[in-house]
């Protein structure tokens, strides 16, 4: 398996069937995946091991290169950063950062498109972000970091990720919709503020 073939597989209707059968070839291309096989996440959020969870997310997202590649890499670093607390519960601190690093190394080595690399990295870096807990300042930072199109992609990705987890938490899908609407409203407000600033500048109050 080479990079071109991998991307072709990712754009199939159900890539998981092929990737499951050819997982050893996937490891030859991206060695970090080997540790994901049968890796028990020991978390109430998850019913699948890391690799199976990744495959389900890959199937769940729309078959575009950005979403499918982001899905493949988004949790690849989980076994690397894994920590277990005294209750035997698994945690994966900053796995998004390490996963983005692994993707970036792969992407640069294989000369992937710069725009694609940037979009995939953003999805990986923000996929686990709890938008419901963000302060107004943090929401403002998100608006500056991501375009409206990228927010739409991110929430598609987050929904696909949730649907590959424990069914008990599917109720959060409604929360995701509200969170998306809330963050998108910040773009409208930001645009309106910019418009009013421009209007005042371009249409100064004339003296009588």
Regions found by a protein language model. Give the residues of each.
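Charged substrate- and nucleic-acid-binding regions of tRNA-handling and nucleotidyl-transfer enzymes
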Residues: 1, 6, 150-208
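A residue-identity detector for tryptophan
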Residues: 45, 96, 198-201
